[in-house]
From Swiss-Prot:
It comes from Lactobacillus helveticus (strain DPC 4571). One of its GO terms (cellular component) is cytoplasm. This is Endoribonuclease YbeY. Its EC number is 3.1.-.-. It is found in: Cytoplasm. The gene is ybeY. Binds 1 zinc ion. GO terms for molecular function: metalloendopeptidase activity; RNA endonuclease activity; zinc ion binding. It comes from the Bacteria.
Length: 174
């Protein structure tokens, strides 16, 4: 499978944890999700770890939500303005930039306690959820939600972080 080139920006020191290689685990999640949605080209994206103030600021400015959130995604292709990438199909060095994620570890930790999922499960859910948004998936309509949360569930299960029966509707907590 072709790789995903991830650029990290860590404003909160999340990746400094010497007891865990977060980047390897994130890559495992991303590659499983990429395989699950049938993407076979080279991808690039960024993941930005931010504090609650920054998450709140971004969420208010771009989503009109007056609170911090776990993840905000900014997809390069959003809506009907899709870019025709077929001109690059014969270029093995071309990387499709899918966008940027802004993740807030402290909100993810709080959600893991609220939903009773544990940090690893909630973090994995959030990474995959954001990645799917960058690739055009959404959960506004029930049929879209079923597809998106189904993909999340399969990826998490492959990582040993299965969804519980009462979480299948949203792919998340209780």
């Amino acid at each position: 499978m072709d790789p995903i080139d991830v650029t990290y920006h860590d404003e909160v020191g999340f990746l400094d944890d010497k007891n865990r290689n977060w980047q390897d685990w994130i890559m495992k999640l991303l590659l499983l999700a990429k395989k699950e949605i049938g993407k076979d080209n080279n991808l690039e994206m960024s993941i930005n770890f931010v504090d609650e103030d920054r998450s709140h600021e971004i969420n208010l400015k771009y989503r009109d939500k007056d609170r911090p959130t776990d993840v905000i995604s900014f997809a390069i292709e959003d809506g009907e303005d899709a870019i025709d990438l077929s001109v690059f199909e014969d270029d093995p060095d071309f990387q499709e930039d899918i966008g940027d994620l802004f993740m807030c570890p402290s909100v993810i930790k709080r959600h893991s306690k609220e939903y009773g999922t544990g940090f690893d499960r909630e973090f994995g859910y959030t990474v995959v959820h954001g990645f799917l948004h960058l690739n055009g998936y959404d959960h506004i309509k029930p049929d879209e939600a079923k597809e998106m949360f189904g993909i999340q569930g399969k990826v998490l299960e492959e990582c040993g972080l299965p969804l519980y029966p009462d979480q299948l509707d949203e792919g998340r907590g209780k």
